[in-house]
C-alpha cells in the first residue's frame, strides 16, 4: 500500500510542477532563481534523459510499461520487503509514470530544472534517479550481508 502512496505523490507533484511551468512560462524561457547556478528553463524534450534518442516515443512508452511492470513484480515478489525498497520502487514507478503521461499527452516531456552544467530535467527524472540509487544501495547492502553470512 505504501508503494502506491509514493507513486501517487510523485506523479501528482511532477504533473503539478509541469503544469505550473506550462501556465506561467513560455517555451524556451529561462528564469534565474540562483544565478548563475540554477534557473527554471521551460523546454519540451523529444528524447530521453539529456535529449538522447529524440522522437522515439513508442520505444519510451514500451520501456516505461516494462519498467512499471517490473516494479509491480518486484513489489509483490520481494520478501521480506524493506521500506527502502518501497521508496526506491515507488520513486522509479512514479517518475516513469510522470514522464509517460507527458509522452502520451504531448509526444514530448516537459523539462524545467536547469543547473546550467547539466542538461535540463524535471522532478520525474529526479525521482527515477533517486529511486534507482535507493534500489542499488538496498541490493548492494543486502548482498554484503549475504556474503558475510556465507563467510561465517
Swiss-Prot record:
Listed InterPro entries: Peptidase_A8
Membrane topology: Multi-pass membrane protein
Catalytic residues, chain numbering: 111, 125
Gene Ontology CC terms: plasma membrane
Cellular compartment(s): Cell membrane
Chief site of localization: membrane
GO BP of this protein: proteolysis
E.C. number(s) listed in UniProt: 3.4.23.36
Gene Ontology molecular functions: aspartic-type endopeptidase activity
Pfam family, one: Peptidase_A8
Keywords: Aspartyl protease, Cell membrane, Hydrolase, Membrane, Protease, Transmembrane, Transmembrane helix
Keyword Transmembrane helix tagged: yes
Residues that span the membrane, as ranges: 33-53, 58-78, 83-102, 120-140
Pathway(s) this gene product operates in, as recorded in its UniProt entry: Protein modification; lipoprotein biosynthesis (signal peptide cleavage)
Keyword Kinase (UniProt): no
Catalytic activity field: Release of signal peptides from bacterial membrane prolipoproteins. Hydrolyzes -Xaa-Yaa-Zaa-|-(S,diacylglyceryl)Cys-, in which Xaa is hydrophobic (preferably Leu), and Yaa (Ala or Ser) and Zaa (Gly or Ala) have small, neutral side chains
Record-stated family: Belongs to the peptidase A8 family.
Function: This protein specifically catalyzes the removal of signal peptides from prolipoproteins.
Protein name: Lipoprotein signal peptidase
Source species of the chain: Pelotomaculum thermopropionicum (strain DSM 13744 / JCM 10971 / SI)
Lineage summary: Bacteria, Bacillati, Bacillota, Clostridia, Eubacteriales
Amino acid at each position: 500500500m505504501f508503494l502506491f502512496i509514493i507513486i501517487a505523490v510523485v506523479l501528482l507533484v511532477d504533473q503539478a510542477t509541469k503544469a505550473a511551468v506550462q501556465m506561467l512560462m513560455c517555451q524556451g524561457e529561462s528564469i534565474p532563481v540562483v544565478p548563475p547556478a540554477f534557473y527554471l528553463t521551460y523546454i519540451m524534450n523529444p528524447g530521453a534523459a539529456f535529449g538522447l534518442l529524440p522522437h522515439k516515443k513508442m520505444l519510451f512508452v514500451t520501456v516505461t510499461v516494462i519498467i512499471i511492470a517490473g516494479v509491480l513484480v518486484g513489489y509483490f515478489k520481494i520478501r521480506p520487503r524493506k521500506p527502502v525498497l518501497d521508496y526506491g520502487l515507488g520513486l522509479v514507478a512514479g517518475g516513469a509514470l510522470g514522464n509517460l503521461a507527458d509522452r502520451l499527452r504531448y509526444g514530448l516531456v516537459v523539462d524545467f530544472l536547469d543547473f546550467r552544467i547539466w542538461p535540463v530535467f524535471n522532478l520525474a527524472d529526479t525521482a527515477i534517479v533517486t529511486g534507482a540509487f535507493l534500489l542499488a544501495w538496498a541490493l548492494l547492502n543486502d548482498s554484503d550481508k549475504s556474503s558475510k553470512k556465507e563467510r561465517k
